[in-house]
Structure formats: structure tokens, C-alpha cells
UniProtKB/Swiss-Prot annotation:
Protein role: Cell wall formation.
Keyword Oxidoreductase attached: yes
Class of the enzyme per the UniProt entry, highest EC level: oxidoreductase
EC number: 1.3.1.98
Subcellular location, record wording: Cytoplasm
Catalytic activity: UDP-N-acetyl-alpha-D-muramate + NADP(+) = UDP-N-acetyl-3-O-(1-carboxyvinyl)-alpha-D-glucosamine + NADPH + H(+)
Pathways per UniProt: Cell wall biogenesis; peptidoglycan biosynthesis
Name listed for the protein in its UniProt record: UDP-N-acetylenolpyruvoylglucosamine reductase
Domain FAD-binding PCMH-type: 45-243
Length: 332
């Protein structure tokens, strides 16, 4: 199922185009900036600049932006930036930030057998968990342990403490490179551990697509018990994760039948450091920024850990975080 976003402009009308972009910025209601430091937008607090950075006013404005943005210019989207490492050489094209505006959070229906919540891509996962608890719905408590937004959780099937995002999804809303909105169901996707891909049999979006919201089906619960479960999860995070330092959460996926943190610790790598990028002594699957780490230092730690763990265990750790952008000069 798909619907077309209503564009509040005449797409055939003459426009005063920006020479640099080929886009009429008068058509936009959001904020477009150039040479934006991405370290301000990612949880590692490191990395280069984005050539362009756009904060849409709302979903309709995002559709307009994508429709007019030059098709040969790269597009990426970000929530709280908790799963990205932007290389020091920066990003071409545009990075679109969703967390400030695509934050609708609605109780769509509530019956004796449960309820349905719609959450926009920019809603923090912990906020969705608390919202569900407030409305006596259970099953979303684990989301309190995910340090990102709904959009990112949908894109990677984020999970923790034995639960995963797509176990609760009834359907999702996506937007493609042309600004067209689509509604899809879990059956349209191949869903696995930290992986979500469209089936080949599903007509593809124009060239790529992004999650802009999702409907979550939850079972009936009790507000107090859910609140206590969320509180317990947050307490566990505080005790076991280095929340006092910039990081991106878990860096590596757990290999089948094992844990990345256990393998890293087994190899004696807790506290391993390059510059200001260090493997946490509290949780071995976290790389923290101890001060002024560069993206290159963080990526070098990642590569070194992968090499050492493989050499000692013959297990190649796969990154859970996304490493994007260009290297600076001759680095790496």
C-alpha cells in the first residue's frame, strides 16, 4: 500500500533555483545549512562536516525537500545519531535530521486485548516505552534500553534484553527518494538480527527509502508494573554501561551463540586506547570518547579490535554502528 505525500506547491511552476543546489529554497519551510559539523549531531561527538544539513518542518516539508533535492546528490537521515560514525573527511550531499520534528506519538486504539501506538521516526525509543506504560500497555519496556529513535530502531531492528523492535510492529510508514509515502507490513521485509531489508518481490521505492514512522501493537498491561520494568532497565544501563562518556552504544553485533563484549574482554582489550578513543573498562562492546577523539581514532580502534579478535578466536566481529563519509587526507 502506498500514498503520495501532498506537495503544498505547484511542482511545475517556475522556480528561483539556487545555483549551488538546483533547488528553490523558497519552497522549503525547514532549515537548510551548509558545512554542518556532524559531531554536534552524533552521540560519539566526533567526525567531520556534512556538505548540507536539513531540518524539515514536518513530514510534508520532508516530502517536498526530497522531491526537489537533486537526484545525483546523496541523501542520508539521522535521528539522535546514536548509531553513526561520520568520518573526519565529512559527508557529501545532505544529512536530514528527523528527531526534532517527526515526533508524533499517538494512541491510535485501545481495547481489552491491547492497543496500537503510532510513533514518528524522531521519537526517542525511551519516550515510546514511557508512553506505552502511561496507557497501560506492555511489551515496549525494552525500548527504554535503546539510546536512539524509532526510525533508527526500525531501520536496524534494534533490540536489547531479549526483545527486538520488529516483534512489536504492525506496519510502518516510509518515504522514498522522490517524496512518495508508502505503508508496508512486516511481511514486506526480511527481518533478522540487526537487519531489515525489503523482499525482492515488493516493488522497490524509487531508489531507496527511509522509515518515517511505525504502528506498534502492544498487549494490555499495568502502568505501575510497566513503569517499574522501565525503571529497572534504565538502572541496569546505568550500572553496566559507560553513560558518562560519549559513545554509540554497542559497537559490534553479537556473533551467533556468543557475545561481542565477552570476546573483546577475553582478548584483553578492555581499556585499549588510541588517542582519546578507548574501549570501555565497564563494558567491552562500548568505545568511548575520553575527550577529543577523532573519528579516525575511533575507527582505528574498531579495526584493531576486529583484527585481534579474529586472530585469537577466528571470529570476525561485524559492526552494529554505521561508518559513513570520507576519510580525511591520507588517514586509514
Amino acid at each position: 500500500m502506498q500514498t503520495k505525500a501532498r506537495l503544498p506547491v505547484d511542482i511545475n511552476a517556475p522556480s528561483l533555483q539556487s545555483p549551488a543546489l538546483g533547488i528553490d529554497t523558497h519552497l522549503l519551510r525547514g532549515e537548510l545549512r551548509q558545512h554542518e559539523p556532524m559531531k554536534q549531531h552524533v552521540s560519539w561527538r566526533a567526525g567531520g562536516h556534512a556538505a548540507y544539513f536539513y531540518q524539515p518542518a514536518d513530514l510534508e516539508d520532508l516530502a517536498v525537500f526530497l522531491h526537489f533535492w537533486p537526484k545525483d546528490e546523496p541523501v542520508m537521515m539521522i535521528g539522535l545519531g546514536s548509531n553513526f560514525l561520520v568520518r573526519d573527511g565529512g559527508l557529501p550531499g545532505v544529512m536530514i535530521a528527523l528527531h526534532a520534528k517527526l515526533n508524533d506519538l499517538l494512541l491510535v486504539e485501545q481495547e481489552e486485548d491491547g492497543g496500537l501506538i503510532y510513533a514518528g521516526a524522531g521519537v526517542p525509543c525511551a519516550k515510546l516505552a514511557r508512553f506505552a506504560s502511561l496507557h497501560n500497555l506492555a511489551g515496549a519496556e525494552f525500548l527504554a534500553g535503546i539510546p536512539g529513535t524509532v526510525g533508527g530502531a526500525l531501520a536496524m531492528n534494534a533490540g536489547c534484553y531479549g526483545s527486538e523492535t520488529w516483534e512489536r510492529v504492525e506496519r510502518v510508514k516510509t518515504i522514498d527518494r522522490d517524496g512518495t509515502l508508502h505503508e508496508r507490513t512486516p511481511e514486506d521485509y526480511r527481518i533478522g538480527y540487526r537487519q531489515v531489508e525489503l523482499h525482492e518481490v515488493v516493488p522497490p521505492d524509487t531508489s531507496c527509502s527511509w522509515f518515517v514512522g511505525g504502528w506498534f501493537r502492544l498487549r494490555p498491561g499495568q502502568q505501575e508494573s510497566s513503569r517499574q520494568a522501565v525503571k529497572a532497565l534504565l538502572g541496569t544501563r546505568i550500572k553496566t554501561q559507560p553513560l558518562g562518556f560519549p559513545s554509540a552504544g554497542s559497537v559490534f553485533r553479537n556473533p551467533p551463540g556468543d557475545y561481542a563484549a565477552r570476546l573483546v574482554e577475553q582478548c584483553g582489550l578492555k581499556g585499549f586506547r588510541i588517542g582519546d578513543a578507548m574501549i570501555s573498562t565497564l563494558h567491552a562492546n562500548f568505545i568511548i570518547n575520553c575527550g577529543h577523539a577523532t573519528a579516525t581514532e575511533i575507527e582505528t580502534v574498531i579495526n584493531t579490535v576486529q583484527d585481534i579478535v579474529y586472530k585469537k578466536t577466528e571470529i570476525r566481529l561485524v559492526t552494529e554502528v554505521r561508518i559513513i563519509g570520507q576519510h580525511k587526507g591520507n588517514e586509514l
